[in-house]
Amino acid sequence: MENSQAKEQQDGVSGVPQSRLKIPAAIFTEYPVSRVWDIVEKVRVGMLTTQFSGGLRARPLEARVDRDAGVIWFVTDVRGAKDDEIGVAHDIGLAFCDDGAHVYLSITGRAFVIRDSGKAKDIWKKTDDAWFPEGSSDPNVRLLRIEPDTAELWDGPSSAAIIVFDCAKSRAA
């Protein structure tokens, strides 16, 4: 068993075993994690997919990147279903698309619902006022902390390649 695990890791790119991804190794390329953050910051709104008892559910949210911590933050409402869904199943998916530049980004990772009025104030944007007229101190404000594990990137109009790398490694570095 150890030999097959070692072989799987050896064959994988950025610590992601090929056998799990089921994508030929020839299409993998390393990209700097900064490219992921650049795309998220430019696109801003991503589709967050969570799990619930009936399957998957996606909704748009405005992202805030914390490059130093290697995480993505979202401001959310405690009254929404996503907080309950994340409380049960932390695994999530994020999708960002810049159609004009032909850039498509898919991120998988883990999400955590956090109540932290200080952090909410730090990352608050004017657009959040539309959802929370009382501002960052609104008692319904919650934060989603997304810890990305893997990012897949289709970058540019002629890109047939999927660029995969391990965000968790960059967070630990």
Walk through the language-model features, giving the residues of each.
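Charged, gly/pro-rich active-site loop segments
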Residues: 2-28, 107-173
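Short, flexible loop segments at the rims of nucleotide/cofactor-binding pockets, characterized by
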Residues: 24-27, 51-53, 71-73
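Charged, amphipathic alpha-helical segments
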Residues: 31-33, 79-82, 125-129
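A short, Trp-centered hydrophobic/proline-enriched beta-strand micro-motif
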Residues: 37-53, 91-96
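General beta-strand recognition
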Residues: 47, 71-73, 152
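Short glycine/serine/proline-enriched coil/turn segments at secondary-structure junctions
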Residues: 53-56, 101-103, 154
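Positively charged, polar, low-complexity stretches
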Residues: 58-60
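A short mixed-secondary-structure module that forms the rim of ligand-binding clefts
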Residues: 64-102
